[in-house]
Every structure is written in structure tokens, then in C-alpha cells.
Amino acid sequence: MDRLATRFHVLAPDTHGAGKGPVWPEDRALVLEDEVTWLEPVFSRAGTPFSLVGHSYGGAVALIAAVHQPERVRALALYEPTLFSLVDAAYLPPNDADGIRQTVERATTALAAGTRDVAAEHFIDYWMGKGVWQATPLARRGAIEATIVNVHGWGQALFNENTPLQAFCALEMPVLLMEGDNSPPSARAVVSLLTQTLPNVELLEFEELGHMGPVTHPEVVNRAIERFLCCNAAV
């Protein structure tokens, strides 16, 4: 974010359950359009048109925002948007989304049992590799465990999204779609479907990076995002 802030007006809002974001609704399952509605004041503050940058869940939210209001979005830079509903719609289970589906179920069960550390281990090891959680310093675990409580909500929103793949055919703005070649099949399956569908897409694969590439290698990923945004600043 600091790198981009030197050249762009950067706004970094929180979604439900994160930072200053609202709590998850208790009376119903949240859908991604709810996130878009929550972010409307930020979009208004950004002015039109604006570019959206998102990773994982945030990338999925950015895609839905663009579908609902394409005239406001100048460009999209997305690192592995996790819109798993697209995989289920294209290929009936069992499919490439099964790994994360099972991980969400196991993490949710662990949370219900009051074992956040177990939930975190399921989630982190799925995305980053077996043993990564046990190798994580104790000083860093608390912050990670605090975010793990969102796993059930994330899973519901991402697997139950009803926007069809064909809707993304109408997105004419430039899209930078990024993935790591060490990422799990679930994330890469979403990227593959979107690459075949988006009409103005650039696919960028990072060698030896995984799903958490923007966190583990921010300079590499942010350099690509900066290049893309600069090239499309006047689109």
C-alpha cells in the first residue's frame, strides 16, 4: 500500500469482520453484494472512475462491485479472487474447490469447539503448505487467529454467490489477473475460468509464489500492480 500511495490516492477499507469493518449479520448469511453496499461511501469518496485492487476475498468483492457498477471502475488488479461459486457452477463436485470447501468445514468445526488455534492451522496450512502454522512464531499467531473467526462467513459468501460466469463477459475495463504457481487448485481454477471469460484480461503468473504472495512477497506483487495501474491511469 505504501508503494502505491506515492503515486495514487489509495483507500484501503475493511470488509465485514476485519479491522474497522462491521460485524457479520446474525439473522442471515452475508452475500458479496452486502460488502459492495458497505463500501459505497468509500467508492463515493474515491470519485469516478476508480481502480480496484483486491486479493482473495477482497478480489471477489471487487469483481462483484465491477459487475454491479462497471461504469465506475477504470481497471481491476486482482490476485487470485476466490469466487469458488464459479468452480461449482462450471464443474459439479467433486472438483478443484473441494480442498478449500473441506478446509472451511474443518475450521468452522474447530471454531465451534473453541479451538481457534486448530482452525488457524487448518486454514493456514491449506493456503501456505502443511506445517506452516506450527512454524509460525507465537507472537504472530494471535493476530492470525483473530481473523480466522471469519472463515465461516467467507466460505458462505464465496460458495453461495449467484453471479454467473457469463456476467463477467460484460466487463470491458482492463483486468490484471495474478496467480502464484504454488497456489492450491481452488484458487487456480477460479483464475482459469475468469481468464477464459474476461474480454480484456492480462494474466500474470508468479513463479514460486502461493496464494499469500501479496503478503509473503509484497514488493514483487505491488510492482506488477503499480505497472498495471500506471499503464491504465488514463483509460
Predicted feature locations:
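Conserved alpha/beta-hydrolase catalytic His-Asp/Glu region
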Residues: A112-H152
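Catalytic active-site module of serine/aspartate enzymes centered on a nucleophile-bearing elbow/loop
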Residues: N200-V235
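Conserved HGGG/HGGXW glycine-rich cap/lid loop of the alpha/beta-hydrolase fold
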Residues: M1-R28, T48
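Alpha/beta-hydrolase active-site loop signature
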Residues: T15-G19, L83, G210
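A catalytic-pocket lid/entrance helix-loop region that shapes and gates access to the active site
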Residues: T82-A112
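Conserved acidic catalytic loop of the alpha/beta-hydrolase fold
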Residues: E33-F50
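Conserved hydrolase catalytic core segment
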Residues: T48-Y91
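Conserved serine/cysteine hydrolase catalytic core
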Residues: A139-Q196, E202-E205
